[in-house]
């Protein structure tokens, strides 16, 4: 009898779908000093996470030196997935990646906020539905 009850419970469990929303893009013509400002970039990523209704776990950043390849990378781990900014100040260029899992978060609002703070002369934005179907 116990076994039958266990089977009944297993059959009534509803699987939660995997919702994946990925927004990413390239920013051109960004101020070089801003792209080198590790502290400000960290702050922008943290603010973007809150705006997008994400739950921040940890933020790490790195400064890379090496001529025309120098830059800053900021990566925020959020419960829902991640936000990343990678910069190339010499080229006035940055890439932004915002990926979330779940219905409640809005990666596009995080991307738009980052763009508003970096003020590129132009940018591209891409969206990919990475949900399990």
Swiss-Prot record:
Entry-linked SUPFAM superfamilies: S-adenosylmethionine decarboxylase
EC number, UniProt record: 4.1.1.19
Protein name: Arginine decarboxylase proenzyme
Sites marked Cleavage (non-hydrolytic): 80-81
UniProt GO BP: arginine catabolic process; polyamine biosynthetic process
Active-site residues from the entry: 81, 86, 101
EC class: lyase
Metabolic or biological pathway, per its Swiss-Prot or TrEMBL entry: Amine and polyamine biosynthesis; agmatine biosynthesis; agmatine from L-arginine: step 1/1
Protein role: Specifically catalyzes the decarboxylation of L-arginine to agmatine. Has no S-adenosylmethionine decarboxylase (AdoMetDC) activity.
UniProt family annotation: Belongs to the prokaryotic AdoMetDC family. Type 1 subfamily.
Catalytic activity: L-arginine + H(+) = agmatine + CO2
Cofactor: pyruvate
Molecular function in Gene Ontology: arginine decarboxylase activity
Oligomer and partners: Heterooctamer of four alpha and four beta chains arranged as a tetramer of alpha/beta heterodimers.
Free-text remark on how the cofactor is bound: Binds 1 pyruvoyl group covalently per subunit.
Cellular component terms per the entry's GO annotation: cytosol
PTM remark: Is synthesized initially as an inactive proenzyme. Formation of the active enzyme involves a self-maturation process in which the active site pyruvoyl group is generated from an internal serine residue via an autocatalytic post-translational modification. Two non-identical subunits are generated from the proenzyme in this reaction, and the pyruvate is formed at the N-terminus of the alpha chain, which is derived from the carboxyl end of the proenzyme.
Keywords from the UniProt entry: Autocatalytic cleavage, Decarboxylase, Lyase, Polyamine biosynthesis, Pyruvate, Schiff base, Zymogen
InterPro entries assigned: AdoMetDC_fam_prok, ArgDC, S-AdoMet_deCO2ase_core, S-AdoMet_deCOase_pro-enz
Modified residues (Pyruvic acid (Ser)): 81
Record organism: Pyrobaculum arsenaticum (strain DSM 13514 / JCM 11321 / PZ6)
